[in-house]
Amino acid sequence: MLTPRVLRALGWTGLFFLLLSPSNVLGASLSRDLETPPFLSFDPSNISINGAPLTEVPHAPSTESVSTNSESTNEHTITETTGKNAYIHNNASTDKQNANDTHKMPNILCDTEEVFVFLNETGRFVCTLKVDPPSDSEWSNFVLDLIFNPIEYHANEKNVEAARIAGLYGVPGSDYAYPRQSELISSIRRDPQGTFWTSPSPHGNKYFIWINKTTNTMGVEIRNVDYADNGYMQVIMRDHFNRPLIDKHIYIRVCQRPASVDVLAPPVLSGENYKASCIVRHFYPPGSVYVSWRQNGNIATPRKDRDGSFWWFESGRGATLVSTITLGNSGIDFPPKISCLVAWKQGDMISTTNATAIPTVYHHPRLSLAFKDGYAICTIECVPSEITVRWLVHDEAQPNTTYNTVVTGLCRTIDRHRNLLSRIPVWDNWTKTKYTCRLIGYPFDEDKFQDSEYYDATPSARGTPMVITVTAVLGLAVILGMGIIMTALCLYNSTRKNIRL
């Protein structure tokens, strides 16, 4: 019976003030295990004005911040006024219905929901704290937590799996390191004397936080932004029981325009397809770049079965994207002008650039190798003027002093091309020797254009004339020997007859 009477006497509003009052008796009677659990694992209520260390929050931004933030402040003023008018308008009917209720829920109004900030620069946002009535005792019941939550752009399903297989994922300092953990940047309280206190930032001067007591605004700066700062800030207002009342998210979008755009169109042989690669270096975040292709000013569409794109992330430098395309080559028309158009987009910011390349086309040369008069002779037709000849014997390059090359005339079918003839003495060493005539100066594999033949100097390969010669010599020797023997016998017989007579 006592409880209903107390409720009727105090009213629900009075009971609400009683619960919010910093009474040691009431606080001791409530078990923390029965309260609503906090959003994250830390407990901001452990950071109190009686604990150490704490730092007094500056009451105004630095001179540099004021000068660089004049435009931002004006925008914030407009946003705050608009938000305030909307707040009053939207809650007019509620105020009339609750005219006797002097306590309202607190609120936080921030000047933006997204902060786009370029690499190594400073990002800023301002929030207005709405507490009614804004008395010192009322302020003392609230805690403002500033929490950073990362967003990792440095991995996708394919390259993360490859990194796991290679044992690189999660290695500190690698491109696949685990993302930065969510962490409490600051926990702010206000004492009854009107002084704001905050816990030290875990990153030193990385974050600068200030509060204007007159306008009840809080400003936050993230200095020297890097890729690890890509994420969102949570501004959470909690009551003295650590229960979240308001939770605002402000996204920090780290930006970096592409540092360079290049098109690589490697040389091709006449009749082979053209291939080109567009390389967009050092931008952020991945996915903010869009690539399109042009061939002689006309739209060219990559084929899914042979073209595509891929990207990788370099620590401290950003993302790099490579897009490829394959185009037909009739072998008759002039090589095309291949252009890559790149658009980088973040929020309302757009940056475009392009690059162009024209591939070089080479024609197939004609060459043949033969042996004549003790020389290996290489005949070459229709090669550019920068092409030279290199001889190899048993696949070993020979000094250019051992052979000579001359220009025999101009190519009749291709302009600015010429014909060559080169020769080198063969080795008459009674063995089988390999000779190679190779063209040097083409932007392809070194052995792309060459011809090889074997010169066989073994006795069996010298042919029938050699056998006939040897046989003739041996036969002549036998005949001469027999003639000498017969002559000697005749002389011997005639001498014996003369002696008998």
Swiss-Prot record:
Q: Which residues form the Ig-like domain?
A: 258-356
Q: Quote the cellular component terms of the Gene Ontology held in the record.
A: extracellular region; host cell plasma membrane; membrane
Q: What domain of life? A: Viruses
| Membrane topology designation | Single-pass membrane protein
Q: Where is the composition biased (Low complexity)?
A: 62-72
Q: Which gene encodes it?
A: gC
Signal peptide from the UniProt entry: 1-27
Q: Which species expresses this protein natively? A: Gallid herpesvirus 2 (strain bc-1) (GaHV-2)
Note the InterPro entries from the entry. Answer: GA_GC, Ig-like_dom, Ig-like_dom_sf, Marek_A
Report TM segments.
466-492
Q: Where is it localised?
A: Secreted; Host cell membrane
- Family assignment from sequence similarity: Belongs to the herpesviridae glycoprotein C family.
Q: What is its main location?
A: secreted
What's the protein called, per UniProt? Envelope glycoprotein C homolog
- Provide the membrane-side ranges marked Virion surface in the record: 28-465
Which ranges sit in the Cytoplasmic compartment? Answer: 493-501
